[in-house]
Amino acid sequence: MIDPIHQFNIEKIFTIGHIGGQEIAFTNSSAYMLVAVAVISLLMIGGVAGRQMVPGRIQSLAEISYEFVAGTIRSTAGVEGLKFFPLVFSLFMFIMISNMVGIIPYTFTITSHLIVTAALALLVFLTVLIYGFYRNGLGFFKIFVPSGVPVFILPLVVFIEVFSFFLRPISHSVRLFANMLAGHIALKVFASFIPLLAGLGIAGYFGAVLPLGMVIALTALELLVAFLQAYVFAILTCIYLNDALHAGH
């Protein structure tokens, strides 16, 4: 059977240089990050260039993406949250496009690596932390003290709030990583059954119909998951940014 884990191997394409004895290399992961950025850039440039009253497909996709993210920010972080639109939009589009590119056979899914999702989650966490203190000063600590909590259980509640706050980047990154990893492993496993069964002759061809159907169904499901995981990451980012914007509310 084909190794379902092999698709996640990071392979060096060429060496860029060395820093402190550590090799800096351009890998397949780096290449697909550039592919994702290129696709997003082409979509947005194509949507803006030659705008028409009756939008075409590219313009419609760009406008729908823009309005969808802007609406998500307004509903979770308020109008003030729109100052973070470039961050949230970039994260949403980068994750969604990366997820969808990874569904194409023989490509690479960069979001199936924890180091990538952890870097994105830490970016959000540090943005919330830095802006929270910049905007609110020590008043940012109010997010750890929910209003209306009885005094006798307040220390426990504060401990839980602080603990959950510092767990945010872990849960934020692992959720995306685990979903993409599990989905692609399942796809690879079912896909590997198709040539194995087809090699058994006529009976095998009939038997291969079931895993083929599963692959088609899982691919459709993975397309949905690719969007949903990008949306979940974006909306959690908005919720966390809301804490920095409205500490203590």
From Swiss-Prot:
Q: Which CDD domains does the record associate with it?
A: ATP-synt_Fo_a_6
The record's keywords, sorted A to Z, are: ATP synthesis, Cell inner membrane, Cell membrane, CF(0), Hydrogen ion transport, Ion transport, Membrane, Transmembrane, Transmembrane helix, Transport
Specify the species: Rhodopseudomonas palustris (strain BisB18)
MF terms from GO for this chain are: proton-transporting ATP synthase activity, rotational mechanism
Q: Which family does it belong to?
A: Belongs to the ATPase A chain family.
List where the protein spans the membrane.
30-50, 84-104, 114-134, 143-163, 196-216, 221-241
Assembly, per entry? F-type ATPases have 2 components, CF(1) - the catalytic core - and CF(0) - the membrane proton channel. CF(1) has five subunits: alpha(3), beta(3), gamma(1), delta(1), epsilon(1). CF(0) has four main subunits: a, b, b' and c.
The name this protein goes by in its record: ATP synthase subunit a
- Give me the Gene Ontology terms describing cellular component: plasma membrane; proton-transporting ATP synthase complex
> Which range is the signal sequence, renumbered to this chain?
none
Membrane topology classification? Multi-pass membrane protein
Identify the gene encoding this protein.
atpB
Q: What does this protein do?
A: Key component of the proton channel; it plays a direct role in the translocation of protons across the membrane.
Chief location of this protein within or outside the cell: membrane
Q: Which PROSITE patterns match?
A: ATPASE_A
Annotated compartments: Cell inner membrane
